[in-house]
Amino acid sequence: MEAGYAEIAAVQFNIAGDNDHKRQGVMEVTISNLFEGTLPAEGGIYDARMGTTDHHYKCITCSHQRKQCMGHPGILQMHAPVLQPLFIAEIRRWLRVICLNCGAPIVDLKRYEHLIRPKRLIEAASSQTEGKQCYVCKAVHPKIVKDSEDYFTFWVDQQGKIDKLYPQIIREIFSRVTYDTVVKLGRSKNSHPEKLVLKAIQIPPISIRPGIRLGIGSGPQSFHDINNVIQYLVRKNLLIPKDLQIVRGQKIPLNIDRNLQTIQQLYYNFLLDSVSTTATQGGTGKRGIVMGARPAPSIMRRLPRKEGRIRKSLLGSQVWSISRSTICGNSDLHLDEVGYPISFARTLQVAETVQHYNINRLMPYFLNGKRQYPGCSRVYKQITQSVHDIEGLKQDFRLEVGDILYRDVVTGDVAFFNRQPSLERSSIGVHRIVVLENPKISTFQMNVSACAWYNADFDGDQMNLWVPWSVMSRVEAELLCSVRNWFISTKSSGPVNGQVQDSTVGSFLLTRTNTPMGKNVMNKLHAMGLFQTTQTDPPCFANYSPTDLLDGKSVVSMLLKQTPINYQRAPTWYSEVYAPYMHYNKQDISTQIRNGELIEGVLDKKAVGAGSSGGIYHLISRRYGPQQALKMIFATQQLALNYVRNAGFTVSTADMLLTPEAHQEVQEIINKLLLESEEINNRLLHGDIMPPIGLTTHDFYEKLQLNALKFPDRILKPIMNSINPETNGLFQMVATGAKGSNPNMIHIMAGIGQIEINTQRIQPQFSFGRTLVYYPRFALEAQAYGFICNSYIAGLTSPEFIFGEMNGRFDLINKALSTSSTGYANRKAIFGLQSCIVDYYRRVSIDTRLVQQLYGEDGLDARQLETVRFETIMLSDQELEDKFKYTGIQSPLFEEEFSRLKKDRDKYRQIFLNVENFNFSQLLTDVRQVPVNVASIVKNILLSSTSGVLPFDEKSILQKYAMVKTFCKNLPYVFINNIQERLQTPIPVYLKRAAALMRMLIRIELATVKTLNITCEQMSAILDLIRLQYTQSLINYGEAVGILAAQSVSEPLTQYMLDSHHRSVAGGTNKSGIVRPQEIFSAKPVEAEQSSEMLLRLKNPEVETNKTYAQEIANSIELITFERLILQWHLLYETYSSTKKNVMYPDFASDVEWMTDFLENHPLLQPPEDIANWCIRLELNKTTMILKSISLESIINSLRAKHPNTYIMHSVENTASGIPIIIRIYLRESAFRRSTNTRMATDEKIAVNVVDKLLNSTIRGIPGIKNANVVKLMRHRVDAQGKLVRLDNIYAIKTNGTNIFGAMLDDNIDPYTIVSSSIGDTMELYGIEAARQKIISEIRTVMGDKGPNHRHLLMYADLMTRTGQVTSLEKAGLNAREPSNVLLRMALSSPVQVLTDAAVDSAVNPIYGIAAPTLMGSVPRIGTMYSDIIMDEKYITENYKSVDSMIDML
């Protein structure tokens, strides 16, 4: 009878009690001895029944040696019970809620029935139970006190009498608790409180203890500390009397009390870490045991942290053998090849089973042995099931079928190649090994274009390489992890690889028109030589004579025709910036490839560069597959490099030198910048700088200086005039996108300009206001603050060099400090999203809980997308009719077609105009990513056709229209199946929406007016190709899209954080570095956000085009507190007087004059009789009042309304220049009195509190709006003719701070277009769906052009909002989303705490996702393992072919 097979569906966690320990234990530890002679002592802590770690003896329980024995636990029967150290808090809860006399609950259990199970006992224990009378025995419940200086001692305080609760007493109390009480308080029967006090503790198996005997030979033997702790525990236990009985309130001997306490401490140290290094009781609250000079180790210490069992052993990948070395470039290798040193190849072994078909190939390895490469090291003999070293074999040893040969690595083997950190799945790729025969080479070699997969370079990076052993693993590796699978990026949907640096320049030079001296014109022989190393099918040169000349375009076309494509785009080489300074050949300003032939233009970064979405290699990959694209990259690279080697290309210092005239012009530009900076300095010295609200004078001055010292665009003019673009290597590198940028060129040739550290100029760090010792005190010239006039080629002075090094040092430190934060953020994202897997309906779910109804809302794989343009979007109604309405045949069908196109256009506009209105910077565009480029398919079909121009046929036109209409109608069935399509079952709305964009594009590109020259057969072929590509673009079942999203967001987010020092200081916001990403992913509430902002559109269209009116509204909503209007204030203790008779502070004696005038002008505002001696004198900032349009009257009225217990006097508003506005606020006696009319003891404290309230008083504005500025917006609208018009004269208000509700109450603000960056504020007012959209837009705003495909952002947003509340990606968010997945939460962090809570709650953990199955030792259901494979064994048996029968058939 065969054994059954089943998978573990779930795991339940419970508290283990005495019975559990006894049932699992194989023996009882009774003595503290370890060994008797060379064998373990029977009954000791090394008893052989618990396993073996020594080769001298076997395990008595299972009779296995040390490698096969898994270990078996033992038990230690305690003479006195001990508390379970992991559940001290749980013990205290139970003691608070149950009667110590009868075990009945003290609290009313019905009050907690509405709570979820885990919360019931916690809430009951937090209620007031002291002094309550038991409902059953009427005993009064005492106060339970936990010892402040001890971790596990409880005291009972009853009417002043304090008794100690020993574990034995607690055990007796808990034994009286009924199971019904346990269940009603939310705990499981398996978590009865009696289990929290143990009489029998478990001794772990020997095999899992951290160590064994360390002492060997003479001298005392040494054992690992954890064994010593167990030894002490056994010895102390023997000192306790077996029949010890402890009665509550009874005194016990001091020595026994100390022994009981020591046993409890030893058990604590045995399970948990010791936090104290003292062996006696101290003030830390816990006692610890010291082993020599270090605290004792523990069992639980092995679980957490990176080196713990969970992360290192259970979740970490392990291989038998691995190699690691530095990488270097080798362009002779294919992109999917890796050069492997021969010394490594002879060390790393590959296991290969001998078969009939490979025995002849393996025999040379067997004969060579270890003496000669390629050889082998050992042989596994199937008959004897033993391993033999190859050097110790006898002469008659034969290699037979079924044996396993451990041979050397040879060329052609597949290997995993990896560079850490592995932030993306492309960080582990499979390459084919090419063994490097040169023994002096000891580095891995790879093609320079392959670095993009690993984010590697050749500045000392090291990588890992290991070879899979079994045939199955080798096949899986090649199919699943081959680098061709990573050619298209999941993050950006574009190609990862392409030409870099030299090959980019070489491709440009080879394909240029009229190259100087005709360098790219060659004869037949030279053209054939360029193809020598391409390793492709050589083109036919038979049609060319030796004297015929070929240009570079012809040579490249010979290569491109092997994979014909159509391509048209402007190259990187052509730039409007350079156009005024150089002459462009008309044939080089647009690159066009038609059916594989380069008609015009050049190949540069935009066409063949790495990461060029929509470039040549992207199109080849989409049409012919990624393997062909990789071959074409290598072939083009070889062509370009061979050409560069022959024609020559270099960058020398001559390319970096300016002519004297150009140098003079550069100096004039720099001198103008310095002059402007000096003018700003003069304005500062004369007090003429007026900063806006929210900025200090210093901050505004620095901002003016930064703007003034920026190099203008015209500095390129002298550079371009002094170089020859046709021959200058540096310029060609920059212009073609091979390397460098315009700022790099300016720094090298003209000047470096202002050095910024953290977006600020160099600030004075030395004493006495100096930036460096080279400059005097308080120097204001730009050079003293980091402005470098010289260029790199001209050389830097000492202070200039130091300024440059300061910037480099800041970047270095910034990167080092950010690495740990970004690494942990990546790990949290991986664990938070890893359970999201695509099911058979292409839904995304966590186990059975839905996250997305359809992945990415369209079910498409991010790697299978192309960028296309929707032609109808920007057209007016008349333009749309002229271009797309077919009038050749009078039929209502074509009216219907045009109406459908118009509706599609309007729908598209409506959707994306709403997106534009509710985002800060995402403007409407007619370019989108779709799975099928319909225009390209049509073009390819027409180019491959030989029928020419066809006459119009009314019947065929109607037939083609019907075909397209039917196809668009049935397109959503691609998500279902053909059966449902034949039955025409109703299509769900969400599937119709998923295919909406694709159907729009098909109707546009296959409109009747555009397909007149297409036959019905061609139309059928086009539609079939569209359906095929669309189907192939769908996401695969079992895809771990959560991990893909985490990797795609975390990697560019890491780069964003490292580049945070480039942020802008404008606007007063702080969206920099790690702050804003943490706010988004941590789901912080509104009050905790540091960088929230709002964009407010104005309701009146006339006002939103007037900046002055918009600024007035911005001033009115900006929160102005009294403190912002004050220059200085004083709290004075003086007697009020309106004359000079009474003594006043001498500095303010002049106030009497305006105080007298105030009383004369305001006869109704006479001082009250109860004025106290406390006065607050304030001087107002007139400049701020003018800029914010705040009158003195409004300030006084606001203060009087909010502070009635004061008497306020003020000077006139229109004071002379230089004389401030003064307000005196006198406190009244009522402010110092209680309701009992008794005077408070500290009048000064009350006066200070009143000052604080005064300063924080709101004068005007919306709470939460710290700053409001007018910004210029760019938006679209549809005019009366139906044309999409771009408006760039709209003014809106951008605020620092958020309060959507407050903004909606303002009559000047349009409530329908309020945009807030705060997820919490959006959620509070608009609901969870709005918060979901806000998460997407905020991640996109933060990451900018480095943002990933929007499907990954949707994954983040849907997961964070799935529960109906915004949950974070932190530990708390994971607990809320997946409370039952204990193993996943344990793998993320704090495994001890997670396991403890799970045991208390008796949690049941269903096994799903990735972490849980991995921890349980099974394979997660993802990818190719998602689907079960059903095998018909009967069919296989009946159709089995032996080797002989196959030979006979052949």
Curated annotation (Swiss-Prot):
UniProt GO BP: DNA-templated transcription; DNA-templated viral transcription
One GO cellular component term: DNA-directed RNA polymerase complex
UniProt-recorded Gene Ontology molecular function terms: DNA binding; DNA-directed RNA polymerase activity
Subcellular location: Virion
Record carries keyword Coiled coil: no
EC code: 2.7.7.6
UniProt key word Transcription: yes
Keywords, ordered alphabetically: DNA-directed RNA polymerase, Late protein, Nucleotidyltransferase, Transcription, Transferase, Viral transcription, Virion
Induction: Expressed in the late phase of the viral replicative cycle.
EC class: transferase
Catalytic activity: RNA(n) + a ribonucleoside 5'-triphosphate = RNA(n+1) + diphosphate
InterPro entries (alphabetical): DNA-dir_RpoC_beta_prime, RNA_pol_asu, RNA_pol_N, RNA_pol_Rpb1_1, RNA_pol_Rpb1_3, RNA_pol_Rpb1_3_sf, RNA_pol_Rpb1_4, RNA_pol_Rpb1_5
Main location: virion
Stated role: Catalytic component of the DNA-directed RNA polymerase (RNAP) that catalyzes the transcription in the cytoplasm of viral DNA into RNA using the four ribonucleoside triphosphates as substrates. Forms the polymerase active center together with RPB2. Part of the core element with the central large cleft, the clamp element that moves to open and close the cleft and the jaws that are thought to grab the incoming DNA template.
Family under the similarity heading: Belongs to the RNA polymerase beta' chain family.
Notes on the domains: Lacks the typical C-terminal domain (CTD).
Quaternary organization: Part of the viral DNA-directed RNA polymerase that consists of 8 polII-like subunits (RPB1, RPB2, RPB3, RPB5, RPB6, RPB7, RPB9, RPB10), a capping enzyme and a termination factor.
Protein name per Swiss-Prot or TrEMBL: DNA-directed RNA polymerase RPB1 homolog
UniProt lineage: Viruses, Varidnaviria, Bamfordvirae, Nucleocytoviricota, Pokkesviricetes
